[in-house]
């Protein structure tokens, strides 16, 4: 029987564990304390967890022993907040074995380094295991998946072999895993879309309507593609499941934590108050700060990101920021804003179109 270790008793970690265990694979969920492990094992569910009729499936178990959790595992899934990735993978690193896949299921960028989670993992594990690193990302709202609704995701790695191996471990009847070898693009799509989800929440909170929100999402996707390409991603990845797919799901659903934060900001609540009231992390808040600094350092114009940054960190009024963004001076939709990557989509005429033979 295949075994998967999940580090992170987060909603997303438990959701992934549930999907994998329902397929008949052994899942060991690592809890940081004996008390947490004992409580989860006894109740077979987290407290205040939705849906209310949810319980751990038969093959999902909990332990406070990291050695036990990792022993014999084919893959370790890191389902922790992005700012906690480094200390957690550092704990696991000495216990990893040569053939064990190490998969990030976190969607964020590290504050201070601007590194993607696969880069953080690579920093902390032996170089001998670097070919085993992969990431999971896509339009994956945890509550829908826990209800058994169909969903798809993307497993990305530097090689198709590693991506396929990881995809096979997580694929289930209602959870299909596609593969991709653009690990940079898949990670950035999942991380940067949270910024736009904050903006979509602001638009919804202000009742700006679908026209304005669709414009925001579309311009946001352009910014994601621009920054992503500048960082080495394939721009086409952002038109796929880990880009556009994840963006649509997160920007249009009330289940999204980042969308929730955006809505609450329009009610006059402070960011600290909103974050303190939440049981889970809204990754877009920290990712906005990282992306804003990246854009400045690379001389990229990202007005959507900049305006959301000002709302979060400079106390800008959400309504004024949104109106300012919508009233921005129009220019060519795809070019003219230092986004040289879009030149690659322009068709070059190397010869005249041949004339048709009238005969």
Curated annotation (Swiss-Prot):
One of its GO terms (cellular component) is cytosol. It is an enzyme of class 1 (oxidoreductase). One of its GO terms (biological process) is carbohydrate metabolic process. Pathway: Membrane lipid metabolism; glycerophospholipid metabolism. SUPFAM superfamilies: 6-phosphogluconate dehydrogenase C-terminal domain-like, NAD(P)-binding Rossmann-fold domains. One of its GO terms (molecular function) is NAD binding. It catalyses: sn-glycerol 3-phosphate + NAD(+) = dihydroxyacetone phosphate + NADH + H(+); sn-glycerol 3-phosphate + NADP(+) = dihydroxyacetone phosphate + NADPH + H(+). It is found in: Cytoplasm. The keyword NADP applies. Pfam families: NAD_Gly3P_dh_C (PF07479), NAD_Gly3P_dh_N (PF01210). Its EC number is 1.1.1.94. Keywords: Cytoplasm, Lipid biosynthesis, Lipid metabolism, NAD, NADP, Nucleotide-binding, Oxidoreductase, Phospholipid biosynthesis, Phospholipid metabolism. The active site is at 193 (proton acceptor). Sn-glycerol 3-phosphate binds at residues 107, 138, 193, 246, 256-258. It comes from the Bacteria. NADPH binds at residues 11-12, 32, 107, 142, 257, 281, 283. Belongs to the NAD-dependent glycerol-3-phosphate dehydrogenase family. Catalyzes the reduction of the glycolytic intermediate dihydroxyacetone phosphate (DHAP) to sn-glycerol 3-phosphate (G3P), the key precursor for phospholipid synthesis. This is Glycerol-3-phosphate dehydrogenase [NAD(P)+]. It comes from Dehalococcoides mccartyi (strain ATCC BAA-2266 / KCTC 15142 / 195).
